[in-house]
A protein has these predicted regions:
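N-terminal leader/targeting and accessory segments in enzymes
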Residues: 1-48, 52-67, 76-78, 194-204
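Hydrophobic alpha-helical packing residues
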Residues: 57-62, 132, 351, 378
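Extended acidic/charged loop-beta regions that coordinate divalent cations
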Residues: 124-173, 206-248
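Beta-strand->loop->alpha-helix junctions that form or flank phosphate-binding loops
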Residues: 71-72, 197-200, 212-234, 251-256, ...
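Active-site-proximal loop/hinge segments that shape catalytic or ion-binding/gating pockets
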Residues: 413
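C-terminal helical cap/extension that packs against the catalytic core
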Residues: 199-217, 221, 236-237, 305-308, ...
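Nucleotide phosphate-binding/pyrophosphate-handling subdomain across enzymes
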Residues: 38, 134, 139-144, 151-162, ...
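ATP-dependent carboxylate-amine ligase catalytic core
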Residues: 22, 26-30, 34-37, 63-156, ...
Length: 430
C-alpha cells in the first residue's frame, strides 16, 4: 500500500467505533513483540492541558539529549503528528511498513471474532509503540486517548503518572459526574509510581485521585503546593514564569494557564531524576523555552489577529477567555464548533462573554453538534450569531467581517481548529 492507501485503511478502522478495554491492545502488542516494554515513559491523563504537558515533557527529555518519543491524539492537520521522535513526525515509508505488518495481525485477530478486532485507536497506539521501540526511543511522553483505566495506552509501565485538571467530558463512556470521570482517569495510576496533578486538593476529583494513589502506595505531588510556580507575566510574546528551583522561564506558548502545565512537566522531570534518568536544570529550562504545540492560543495572523485554540471544556474555555481579555482590549469575532460529547452550553457561555459576534459551525465529523445547535447556545450570550455549516466557510466569513483591529478566534474542538489550520496553512503557502 502507498501512503494514501495506508491512511485509508487506518481511517477505515473508525467504523469499529470506540471499544474501551485492554484485551485487544494487549494481544495486538504481544503479536508485535511487546514494543511497549522497550522504552521508559511518562503517562499523561486529564481533561485540560494533557497534550501541552506531554509536549513539554518530551521537549525537556529531548533537550537533555535523550531519544524522546511523543504520542498524542487526535492530530490537527497531519495524522503523522500523533507519533513523533525528537520532534520529527513518523516518516511516511516507516508508517506504511509498520501498518502493513500490523494489518496482518489485525486480520488474524478478526478471524478469531469480531469482538477481538482492534479499533483505530488501538492500531494507532500499537503503531506508535512499534515505531518507538524499533527506533531506539529511550523515554516517551504518552498521552491518554480517552479516560485512562481502559484506554489503549494503559498497557505501559510508566516512571511517572500525570493527571491534569479534570472536567465533564466523554460522559457516554466515562460517567456522568466528576467523581466517576476522575475514577477512570485515576485508573492509569500504577503501584509505587509517583502521581503529579494540577487538581485542587479541595476538589472531589482530587479525593478520588488521592484515594487511588493511596491504595497503590503512590506519592501524590500537587502543583501549587508540592510543586511551586508563579506567573510573572503573559503577553503576545509568551508566558514568563518562575518554576520550582530553576527560576524564570519564558514559555513560547500563550496563556497563563500554561504555567500549571509547565509545572507538571517540571515535576515529571524531577521524578525521572529520582528514578535514575539524569535531567539537568538547564535541560528543563531549555525544553520549556523551546516547546512547540500548535493550536493552543496560537496567533497565526495579524490585522486582524487570528487565534486558533482547541479548548473543548468549560474550564478550558474560561481560562482562554480570561487570557484573551488580558491580551486584547477588544471583544472577539468568534467561530465555534464543538463535538457532541462536550458541555456545549458551558463552553458557549465563557466564549460568548468575550464576543461581539459569533459564527456557529461544525467540523466534518458525525460527532459534532449541528451548527444550528451551537448557535442556540450562543444566542443567549452574543448579540449577533450566524450559522455557517463549513468550518472553512466560517473562517472565510469571519475574515470578511473582522476589521484590521479585531481578534478572530477559532475554537471549541481540535477538529474545528484542525480544519481551519489546514486551510490557513495552504492559504499562507500560496
Amino acid at each position: 500500500m502507498d501512503y494514501q492507501d495506508t491512511l485509508g485503511w487506518l481511517f477505515g478502522l473508525e467504523t469499529m467505533g470506540i471499544k474501551l478495554g485492554l484485551q485487544n491492545i494487549t494481544e495486538l502488542l504481544h503479536r508485535m513483540g511487546d514494543p511497549q516494554e522497550q522504552f521508559r515513559s511518562v503517562h499523561v491523563a486529564g481533561s485540560n492541558g494533557k497534550g501541552s504537558v506531554s509536549a513539554m515533557t518530551e521537549s525537556i527529555l529531548r533537550h537533555q539529549g535523550y531519544r524522546a518519543g511523543l504520542y498524542t491524539s487526535p492530530h490537527l492537520v497531519d495524522f503523522r503528528e500523533r507519533i513523533q521522535i525528537n520532534g520529527v513526525v513518523i516518516p511516511e515509508e516507516t508508517l506504511c511498513r509498520l501498518v502493513e505488518e500490523l494489518r496482518g495481525h489485525v486480520e488474524d485477530m478478526n478471524l478469531v471474532s469480531k469482538e477481538s478486532h482492534p479499533t483505530f485507536f488501538e492500531v494507532t497506539t500499537a503503531l506508535a509503540f512499534s515505531h518507538f521501540a524499533e527506533s531506539g526511543v529511550e523515554v516517551a511522553a504518552v498521552e491518554v486517548g480517552m479516560g485512562g483505566r481502559l484506554d489503549a495506552t494503559n498497557v505501559i509501565s510508566p516512571d511517572c503518572t500525570i493527571i491534569t485538571r479534570i472536567s465533564l467530558e466523554h460522559t457516554k463512556y466515562l460517567g456522568n459526574n466528576l467523581v466517576q470521570i476522575a475514577g477512570e482517569k485515576a485508573g492509569i495510576i500504577k503501584s509505587g509510581v509517583s502521581v503529579i496533578t494540577a487538581e485542587s486538593s479541595e476538589s472531589e476529583a482530587f479525593s478520588v485521585i488521592a484515594e487511588a494513589a493511596k491504595e497503590k502506595g503512590c506519592p501524590v505531588r500537587v502543583v501549587g503546593q508540592d510543586i511551586q510556580w508563579r506567573l510573572i507575566g503573559s503577553s503576545l510574546q509568551g508566558t514568563l514564569m518562575s518554576i520550582g528551583d530553576i527560576g524564570e522561564v519564558r514559555l513560547p506558548l500563550l496563556g497563563s494557564f500554561q504555567g500549571a502545565n509547565a509545572a507538571m512537566a517540571y515535576g515529571a522531570a524531577r521524578e525521572l531524576n529520582r528514578r535514575g534518568l539524569e535531567i539537568e536544570d538547564d535541560a528543563i529550562a531549555r525544553g520549556l523555552s523551546n516547546v512547540r504545540w500548535p493550536g493552543r492560543l496560537e496567533i497565526v495572523g495579524t490585522m486582524p489577529h487570528v487565534v486558533f485554540d482547541v479548548s473543548h471544556t468549560p474550564d478550558g474555555a474560561k481560562a482562554v477567555a480570561e487570557d484573551l481579555d488580558r491580551l486584547f482590549s477588544q471583544k472577539v469575532v468568534l467561530i465555534l464548533g464543538v463535538l457532541d460529547d462536550k458541555d456545549l452550553d458551558g463552553i458557549a457561555g465563557h466564549f460568548g462573554r468575550i464576543s461581539k459576534c459569533a459564527i456557529a459551525t461544525a467540523p466534518a465529523t458525525p460527532r459534532a453538534y449541528p451548527a444550528e445547535r451551537v448557535a442556540e447556545s450562543l444566542r443567549g450570550h452574543v448579540p449577533k450569531v450566524v450559522v455557517e455549516l463549513s468550518v472553512v466557510e466560517a473562517l472565510r466569513k469571519g475574515l470578511a467581517k473582522a476589521s484590521v483591529d479585531d481578534v478572530l478566534l477559532v475554537t471549541g474542538s481540535l477538529y474545528t481548529v484542525g480544519e481551519a489550520k489546514a486551510w490557513w496553512d495552504l492559504r499562507e503557502a500560496r
